[in-house]
Regions:
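Bacterial N-terminal signal peptides
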Residues: 8-18
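Short sequence/structural segments immediately N-terminal
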Residues: 23-450
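Positively charged n-region of N-terminal signal peptides that target proteins for export
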Residues: 1-6
């Protein structure tokens, strides 16, 4: 079945390119051995599409050059195909070159536009945590809103709510999690709500920005297959996946040999031999072995490693039992079951160990809350601050490090730090229970080493 899919894919791709491809001329730069592709805009485009290309070649040449180097530029997919919208679209506007015509465009291109040519990929994406769930945690969660606007946006210090200064911290979150796009009177985005990450919500009701992984305007499959594509969001103390990967044996091999690997193979054909070790995409998305390519990154996941307490995934976050089996199929591409079983056992038992610390922390938290011995501000209360540190920083390092073969992250930066934090939690708990009051001076330094 997989062979049939591959054959049909190759034939359809070949036919599509032969019918509508733009002509590209290869020129060699003397001495530098650099190749440049000069697109001749005289075949496969409507007059309107040509006008867009020629105008933007002058106004935004970097965008056009990037597009020319991508596969869309060589398959007659132009600005016109992706940016033109209906006149009654809430995002419809006209640039100076279009005024007086019936053509309306938008700088915003959502996954629904991509879905016209890539319906399967978009359908899978919309079922993943990269879609609606990612947006909710930033834009629909009361605690996150308080953190972004009242605390980080200095509303608590007198900054006017809703002012540019007040809302600017949101930009860093929406770069990955996505924004709720707001429009001005000309239907152009305002209030720093665009561009946004993979879970951006658009005024026409559509969701998702494929360009987060396939950066516009080259939209490269090779880029999305490299760990750097994931590492721009999955990094830092609260989700250090790229740091874990780089320190793992997989990351070591990518660092040493990655430039020699083939990242351009067609979907369903990208297999071991094109690479010597997996990138993020190989394990979580690629059609390796008996697996089919997927844009639903939940499908091969077992645990909710982001949460305060780790449980098997269920419901809209995926099927953890099925995910475990699917991920093991990916591992079979390079490893024996003996090797993989050890890795999965280390992951699972590290998670069980973390949960022991979290459960005891939750018990102490419950008793302190019942006795009114927790501060009202979680950012300044010593116990609440350490509790967040335990799960969001040290706890995630331990769990994710164990899941991705990052030994130091799992142990020294993870479990060892959990032990130290837990001892401080116990000390604060014991003081408050014994004295029936909150300590006058917090034992925790805000903004300490995380």
């Amino acid at each position: 079945m997989k062979t049939l899919r591959i054959t049909l894919l190759i034939l359809s791709t070949f036919s599509f390119i032969m019918i509508g491809t733009a002509h590209a001329e290869q020129t060699q730069t003397d001495g530098l051995k650099l190749q440049h592709k000069a697109l001749v805009v005289n075949r496969g485009y409507t007059e309107e599409a040509k006008n867009c290309i020629e105008c933007h070649s002058q106004k935004t040449p970097g965008i056009v050059e990037n597009w020319k180097n991508g596969k869309m530029g060589h398959a007659s997919i132009s600005c016109y195909d992706c940016h033109v919208v209906e006149k009654d679209s809430p995002m419809a506007s006209q640039c100076e070159g279009l005024r007086g015509t019936d053509i309306y465009t938008s700088p915003m291109v959502s996954s629904s536009t991509c879905g016209r040519c890539h319906p399967r990929e978009v359908e899978q994406f919309l079922k993943s945590s990269h879609a609606e769930l990612s947006n909710k945690i930033i834009n629909d969660t009361p605690w996150t809103k308080r953190l972004i606007y009242y605390e980080e946006g200095a509303q608590s210090l007198g900054v006017k709510p809703g002012s540019a200064t007040n809302i600017v911290p949101r930009n860093s979150c929406q770069a990955c999690h996505g924004a709720n796009v707001e429009l001005g009177p000309d239907n152009k985005p305002i209030n720093m709500t665009w561009p946004g990450g993979h879970s951006t919500r658009y005024p026409d009701g559509s969701l998702g920005n494929c360009g987060t992984c396939h950066t516009r305007h080259e939209f490269s499959v090779a880029e999305a297959r490299k760990p750097e594509a994931c590492g721009s969001c999955h990094l830092g103390p609260d989700h250090p996946q790229i740091e874990i990967y780089e320190a793992s044996k997989h990351g070591q091999l990518f660092s040493v040999h990655g430039e020699e690997w083939n990242f351009e193979a067609a979907p369903e054909t990208w297999e071991p031999g094109d690479y010597d070790a997996p990138t993020c995409a190989v394990c979580h998305m690629s059609g390796i072995g008996e697996l089919s390519t997927t844009h639903n990154i939940n499908e091969r996941l077992t645990w909710n490693l982001w949460a305060p307490r780790t449980e098997k995934r269920t419901g809209e976050r995926g099927d953890g039992l099925k995910g475990d089996k699917e991920m093991r199929k990916a591992c079979k591409g390079c490893h024996s079951s003996l090797h993989s079983n050890v890795a999965f056992e280390i992951r699972d038992e590290t998670i069980n160990l973390y949960n022991v610390y979290w459960d005891k922390t939750a018990e102490m938290n419950k008793e302190l809350a019942e006795k009114n011995l927790l501060g009202k501000d979680p950012l300044s209360d010593g116990f609440l601050q350490l509790k967040q540190y335990l799960y969001m920083y040290a706890g995630r390092r331990a769990r994710q490090g164990a899941a991705m073969a990052g030994a130091d992250m799992a142990q020294l930066q993870g479990l060892y730090t959990i032990v130290k934090v837990f001892k401080d939690l116990e000390a604060i708990y014991n003081y408050r229970i014994k004295n029936n009051k909150i300590e006058e001076l917090s034992t925790v330094m805000n903004g300490g080493d995380i």
